[in-house]
Amino acid sequence: FLPAIAGMAAKFLPKIFCAISKKC
């Protein structure tokens, strides 16, 4: 992956996990 894509994933994945698990 490109560093930019990895950076985006690092930002969005925690938010998605937070929304699914509802543990923010």
Swiss-Prot record:
UniProt-listed GO biological process terms: defense response to bacterium; defense response to fungus; killing of cells of another organism
Tissue: Expressed by the skin glands.
Pfam families: Antimicrobial_1
KW Protein biosynthesis (keyword) present: no
Disulfide bond keyword on record: yes
Function: Antibacterial activity against Gram-positive bacterium S.aureus and Gram-negative bacterium E.coli. Has activity against C.albicans.
Coiled-coil intervals, chain numbering: none
Record's protein name: Brevinin-1Bb
